Amino acid sequence: MNPLIVSPRSPRTIIAFALSALLLGGCATFSNDGGFNTVTQITQDRAGKTVKAIRSDDDAASVQSSIKARLAKPLDAGDAVQIALLNNRGLQATYAELGIAEADLVQAGRLHNPGFTFRRTRQGDDVLIERTFTMNLISLITAPLAQKIEGRRFEQVKLLVANEALRVAAETRRAYFDAIAGGQGVDYARQVNLAAEAGADLAHQMGRSGNWSALEQAREQAFYAEATAGVARAMKASVMAREKLTRLMGLWGDDIHFQLPERLPELPAQPLELDNAESMALQNRLDIQAGKLETAGLASSLGLTKTTRFVNVLDLGYIHNNQTGLPPERGYELSIEIPLFDWGGARVTKAEAIYMQSLHRLAETAVNARSDVRESYLGYRTAYDLARHYRDNIVPLRKKISDENLLRYNGMLISVFELLADAREQVASVNGYFDALKDYWIAETDLQAALGGKLPDNNSVMKGQ
């Protein structure tokens, strides 16, 4: 490569230009919060809870102190969610994505390191010294656009991290209600088992006295055996639900012995009315907002690819050569890649395909969000109506039937076995209400997630729940 020699003034201009570029490139620094303030604000606004990235022993001690204070009393759903947001290790790993994205942003704002070449050769008594200082001009020209692309990427990661925090919060709420319902399921199974045991004992005694057939005895014994198996199944389901909640909260050791309320929260007085659920979802969902940022970033990347389609390598160098007996040789050299075989068409086509792929995925996300919120709202209203139906109709009717049967039993109009069977049916109706109540709270959580993590102000969500 032959250097092009210019007047002594031009190299000074080149050096000044290079130093200015380096100074500007060095201005790219890390933010004080590492992007975490956005995640904190979104989580506080939509879930009413705080988040904290554990980066030091002091942070870990502060988090543990907060967790211990909440574990000292029976947990409500809000406590469980707060513990998960602070202590879930998978979520803490997600928080680290902010640091990775910001590092990429800062790196995009910094120029490539310049190169310096020194060469000394001797030919007889003659000494030739060559000095070359080079810079990558392409990185200088494209740095603003690259930084803009990474800036959008950083904003996208903020939304994705906040969305993951809201997902963990929703999953913890579901697990919380499942865990309480699991405990109630064990209580119901034990009540049924006690009634079945009483019926089996009575049938055995009456059979021994000849007042009960072997067939009837076998039926009562079979029901008792099935009820005993039901207790085992209920206990297993309860342990699994509680362990899922434990994992989401990131608890271990003595902390796993946390206390839960014995009963689920009662049904709200009125359900939530939504007339614009789809528009709310499209406006508030973080996955849609992140998808828009991704698409905008890819559009910028496509522009960058087209900009560097023909010229991908462009180096500018300042030359200072000294040779014995000759005046110094100064100038600059320009190194450029010749697009002889690769005209950049493949890279542009690939960038265009990736951009179109992002557009279609964003459209898919929007379509799925509309469907998700419609389905969630239907499930929410159905769950509310079903729970209210159990509370206002089925349970009162079963109680009335039980009261009437007790009067008939006292009047010797029905047998004790009929009374026990009626008691089992009444317990089943109450348990059905508890199941419907659990389904309602989970359905409300699903609706909240489908709307972007927050229900309207006139919602039926219990504060603290």
Sequence positions of predicted segments:
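Short, charged, amphipathic alpha-helical segments
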Residues: 95, 148-151, 214-223, 416-424
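C-terminal structural cap/anchor segments
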Residues: 347-389
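Short segments within alpha-helical structural elements
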Residues: 197, 226-253, 361, 369, ...
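Amphipathic alpha-helical coiled-coil scaffold segments and their short linker/junction regions
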Residues: 70, 80-87, 149, 212, ...
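Periplasmic alpha-helical coiled-coil/stalk elements that build and connect Gram-negative outer-membrane
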Residues: 2, 28, 143, 159-280, ...
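Terminal intrinsically disordered/low-complexity segments used for targeting and assembly
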Residues: 2-86, 235-280, 448-465
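A small-residue-enriched
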Residues: 27-49, 82-139, 242-251, 276-346, ...
